[in-house]
Swiss-Prot record:
Major localization class: cytoplasm
EC numbers for this chain: 6.3.4.19
Protein name (database record): tRNA(Ile)-lysidine synthase
Role according to the record: Ligates lysine onto the cytidine present at position 34 of the AUA codon-specific tRNA(Ile) that contains the anticodon CAU, in an ATP-dependent manner. Cytidine is converted to lysidine, thus changing the amino acid specificity of the tRNA from methionine to isoleucine.
Cellular compartment(s): Cytoplasm
Domain comment in the entry: The N-terminal region contains the highly conserved SGGXDS motif, predicted to be a P-loop motif involved in ATP binding.
Family according to the record: Belongs to the tRNA(Ile)-lysidine synthase family.
Domain of life, per lineage: Bacteria
GO molecular function: ATP binding; tRNA(Ile)-lysidine synthase activity
BP GO annotations: tRNA modification
Pfam families membership: ATP_bind_3, TilS_C
Protein residues bound to ATP: 26-31
Gene: tilS
């Protein structure tokens, strides 16, 4: 088995000579066998070898015994091994995810930190051929896409190097036999036999029959994946280049683009661009680039972008929201403003903080000639005091300057293409009679129409908007 694993390392160029290698060791037979094999190859390959164990503290004393066994076996092999405890419950509460997702995210955070600490460029995990079969059929069952691998990759970029899986062509049976042959100790996690987890159900109920039909099924899945991966790599590079061309804004938590530019692209590129966007946002939320994109999610987004409504919002799992506003589409994880009704007295001089920005008021001796709509200047005698800053109410209307009749504030927002997420938070300047004097940045009322002969004290009100993702 050692010779096969070494050949796999060479064929797939998992790492070279004189490399700093970190092995993730859980205490189970797979990772303990991997650690032993790497310890045997250490001198020949001139490796600096390290181990890391993550104690998720999910099984009480059993978890502690796993950690103790890993430490003692690593010491026996002369491999420095660091054990790190993590708080899965706290991560679950903060990020609103399940136990398995929280444990995985924390585990890989530890792996990244440990790679940096020991200056490792390669992280080895003990995924094997049976895992590949389980993974492939789990993905097919839940609805995978050709955008991602069907099985498990031999390598992938991770932290400041790569994550590699040297045991992918080995079966579970061969690994356990190796442990018995070499007297390698290991522990069995009893939760691996629980029907509560999807992977366990596939492992116990489906995989044995598939392996019985063809003991080399994991190799066939691997070959299928390699061919598909080459095809997908080419299409994904095309999608990345096209996405870079149509992006209008990009931040850590949001991506904005023109809807028409996305919809004009061929469907294979559309799907891959959406996939790239979701992965980018998911990485910034959880710190792990493992977003599982279901086909119906991608198609749902495509259909959403084709709707005739000028503005709409789509909520997706993973705290991702897709918002279309007229010709643009915003993919974001940034929280949208949730505004309750507010009404604040506007002191003169003074200021009012609103969810969208700051309103300031002061008196002036001269009427300003304004060249923008973020400020308004008028005679104090024109309005009924006190003045207030509030957000909109149902049925709000104003009498627009330069127009006859009245206009609903909601219609004003629509006509001026104000983002739906901002409308309920938008500040309005009203007088003592609750008449709308000014919709900042959008419209003034006829009440503030300037007279030919300006006399008396003048009031100047400005609106400074916050930055919006």
């Amino acid at each position: 088995m050692e010779a096969r694993v070494e050949q796999f390392i060479e064929n797939n160029r998992l790492f070279g000579m004189e490399t700093n290698v970190l092995v993730a060791v859980s205490g189970g037979p797979d990772s303990m066998a991997l650690l032993a094999i790497m310890a045997n190859l250490r001198e020949k390959w001139k490796l600096n070898l390290f181990g890391v164990h993550v104690n998720h503290r999910l099984r009480g004393e059993e978890s502690n015994k796993d950690a103790e066994l890993v430490q003692s076996f690593s010491a026996r092999l002369g491999v420095p091994c660091n054990v790190k405890d993590v708080d899965v419950a706290a991560f679950k509460a903060e990020h609103h995810v399940g136990t398995q997702q929280a444990a995985r995210a924390l585990r890989y955070q530890v792996f990244q930190g440990e790679m940096e600490r020991v200056h490792a460029t390669v992280l080895l995990t003990a995924h094997h051929g049976d895992d590949e079969v389980e993974t492939a059929f789990m993905k097919l069952t839940r609805g995978t896409t050709p955008l991602t691998k069907l099985g498990i990759a031999a390598t992938r970029p991770f932290a400041n190097g790569v994550l590699a899986r040297p045991l992918l062509e080995e079966t579970k049976r061969s690994i356990v036999a190796y442990c018995h042959e070499k007297a390698i100790p290991y522990r069995i996690d009893q939760s691996n036999f629980s029907d509560a987890y999807t992977r366990n159900r596939f492992r116990m109920n489906m995989a044995p029959y598939l392996v019985e039909e063809n003991p080399h099924i994991h190799k066939h899945i691997g070959r299928f994946d390699r061919w598909q991966e080459e095809d997908n790599h080419y299409l994904m590079e095309q999608a990345k280049a096209h996405l870079d061309q149509i992006l209008t804004k990009k931040s850590e938590k949001s991506i904005e683009l023109e809807i028409q530019a996305l919809c004009l692209a061929p469907f294979p590129l559309q799907r891959r661009m959406i996939h790239l966007i979701l992965n980018y946002l998911h990485l910034n939320v959880y710190g792990v680039n493992d977003m599982r994109v279901f086909p119906d999610a991608i198609e749902q987004i495509q259909a959403f972008l084709q709707t005739s409504a000028p503005s709409a919002q789509l909520d997706l799992p993973g705290r991702v929201q897709v918002k279309r506003s007229y010709g643009t589409c915003l993919f974001t994880t940034a929280p949208f403003i949730e505004t309750k009704a507010y009404c604040h007295l506007l002191s003169i001089p003074g200021k009012v903080d609103t969810p969208l920005g700051v309103i300031r008021a002061d008196t002036r001796e001269e009427l300003l000639e304004l060249e923008h709509t973020d400020a308004v200047s008028f005679q104090v005698s024109q309005v009924a005091f006190p003045l207030y800053i509030r957000n909109r109410k149902p049925g709000d209307k104003l009498s627009p300057s330069g127009m006859s009749g009245s206009k609903k504030v909601n219609r004003l927002f629509i006509d001026r293409k104000v983002d739906r997420a901002k409308r309920d938070a938008w500040p309005l300047l009203v007088d003592a009679n609750d008449s709308i004097l000014w919709v900042p940045s959008l419209q003034t009322s006829r009440i503030l129409t300037r007279s030919a002969n300006v006399q008396g004290e003048l009031l100047h009100v400005t609106f400074s908007q916050h930055k919006w993702p």
